[in-house]
Amino acid sequence: MPRKTPIERYRNIGISAHIDAGKTTTTERILFYTGVTHKIGEVHDGAATMDWMEQEQERGITITSAATTAFWKGMAGNYPEHRINIIDTPGHVDFTIEVERSMRVLDGACMVYDSVGGVQPQSETVWRQANKYKVPRIAFVNKMDRVGADFFRVQRQIGDRLKGVAVPIQIPVGAEEHFQGVVDLVKMKAIFWDEENQGIKFEYRDIPPELAATAKEWHDKMVEAAAEANEELLDKYLGGETLTEEEIKHGIRVRTIANEIVPMLCGSAFKNKGVQAMLDAVIDYLPSPLDVPAITGHDEHDNEIERHPNDNDPFSALAFKIMTDPFVGQLIFFRVYSGVVNSGDTVYNAIKEKKERLGRILQMHANERKEIKEVYAGDIAAAVGLKEATTGDTLCDPNHVIILEKMIFPEPVISQAVEPKTKVDQEKMGIALNRLAQEDPSFRVQTDEESGQTIISGMGELHLEILVDRMKREFGVEATVGKPQVAYRETVRNKVEDVEGKFVKQSGGRGQYGHAVITLEPAPQGKGYEFVDAIKGGVIPREYIPAVDKGIQETLKAGVLAGYPVVDVKVTLTFGSYHDVDSNENAFRMAGSMAFKEAMRKARPVLLEPMMAVEVETPEDFMGNVMGDLSSRRGLVQGMEDIAGGGGKLVRAEVPLAEMFGYSTSLRSATQGRATYTMEFKHYAETPNNVAEAVINAKHK
């Protein structure tokens, strides 16, 4: 079956927003309008529109799926049909892993901002992740009908706080309760949507006279931004010629895809205004899979290879989310980068190095799931029947293996012991935790060897709370949770040279002999562990050098201070000796381990603790309480600013995670429940001596 929609008419987009910016309503409206036009396209007597509306009102469609497919022919029906795959992204900081994961498979994004709140803390996190994966974006300023709505303030904030170049391609007609529509700066016409039929109908009118000067000013700025796309447009613009609508759109498209500008639109999803024009902007300015660079990966021999977004290249795809569905079991959502795959085909999981049969393939539409036989380059779909796949795995053609860049997930910073309340819960808990860990790579489960307890680790207190809650709701497991524990690390501050480890054993028969001399020094933060082989003249035979490295790596798991993992160290193997008969891999593994332990003791070992970026939004009256409380928690206040719309103050601080337990309770009591906060992991920093001593002593008890 040939593909219905050519790949240049695909748009894989994410809609991301701060919690209250109205993302769900915006997404619902997109599904509503695309569903309506899709249905109208099929039924020519017009009746479909109405019943679809009733059903929509009755059910209030909300995406629960990770990816939904919609079709769009333009607000005025003037485009060939485009296929828009919408990937859902959560708005909460503890789940930035989800956002990161979806950014990896998007080609473009629509950032939704609240017209009053503007750019908020989480908007910054999402923006940084979009920068990391070079995702082109458009901005939609929602809730223009709210009291305090200010489109231009949000435009300034995108510049000041996010360092983005926001170029309005619309400006609002009115604001707050007088918000009526928008001025399309490309056409230089005002658009008014008809509220009677939920904004399906609209009309272009002349720009209201009181807005003419403002519209001209922003139109000129937009044209200038578009003209900078290439020499040809720039020459025409500088020569005083007028750019056509097509040229303006082309210029904006080129610069948006190059991540140089962010086109800005506005509306009120709730009042059915503006979302339709935003969908047109998705088609006009966001890239198709052909407009973004080809995906690169490595073959089995670690050579870099490319896969192009066409159906004739070998099949390659990335699994980006796992969901457990009550009807079909486990769903693996995947993005196809190249080639075609059919249900029933065998695919190769390049990370797990296993072949698996692809069972059914499903695609989610606005309000239904549809079973499909095949998916093509650029598609996003969900597979049933893959047992081995987890998030971040590459699925590919078994005869043309590629490993796409593995997703890098943050290390958890907090852990808790969890115990089932009854014997019956014991077995169910194991199954539940494994299922949850499969879905969420930033959540880890392990067993403490000393105590035998099950330890769960994640990105924050809220993250673990929600997972324990899901265990109860979805799997019926009651569990008690221990006190949260901080994931400390150890490292060294000094360089030490010529430290030796010698493992010699003579006890009748064949002995053991391994001898290694190392230099240990601090490595840059975030580097992890680096091993350099500087052996000259064969003083240690080649085949034993990996054993020394292995011995050191095993020792890194538990440092000399308090048994925490060791990070950011560089070890150079400089010298050693061997015995013709008694030397073996095990002896050199032991020698490496002994040398490292000894070197670490001498290199001024220190304890590191996770530092969190904390942002508190509080009414001004409680400012003193909040600051005092953060300082008492060894917090460093890094800045304060007014919250837009007279909503109090935003305090930014860096606070050790160890001091943040129970913070939500004490913040509630310090501010009568009127402040809110977010926190996310920033980096590891050296723990002050008095605190480190207490941690080390507690560990040795």
From Swiss-Prot:
This protein's record includes keyword Membrane: no
InterPro entries tied to this protein: EFG_II, EFG_III, EFG_III/V, EFG_IV, EFG_V, EFG_V-like, EFTu-like_2, G_TR_CS
GO biological process: ribosome disassembly
Location(s), subcellular: Cytoplasm
Residue sites binding GTP per the record: 17-24, 88-92, 142-145
Name of the protein in its database record: Elongation factor G 1
Role played: Catalyzes the GTP-dependent ribosomal translocation step during translation elongation. During this step, the ribosome changes from the pre-translocational (PRE) to the post-translocational (POST) state as the newly formed A-site-bound peptidyl-tRNA and P-site-bound deacylated tRNA move to the P and E sites, respectively. Catalyzes the coordinated movement of the two tRNA molecules, the mRNA and conformational changes in the ribosome.
Keywords linked to the UniProt accession: Cytoplasm, Elongation factor, GTP-binding, Nucleotide-binding, Protein biosynthesis
GO cellular component: cytoplasm
Recorded family membership: Belongs to the TRAFAC class translation factor GTPase superfamily. Classic translation factor GTPase family. EF-G/EF-2 subfamily.
GO molecular function annotations of the record: GTP binding; GTPase activity; guanosine tetraphosphate binding; translation elongation factor activity
Gene3D superfamilies, A to Z: 3.30.230.10, 3.30.70.240, Elongation Factor G (Translational Gtpase), domain 3, P-loop containing nucleotide triphosphate hydrolases, Translation factors
One Pfam family named in its UniProt record: GTP_EFTU_D2
Domain tr-type G: 8-290
Primary site of residence: cytoplasm
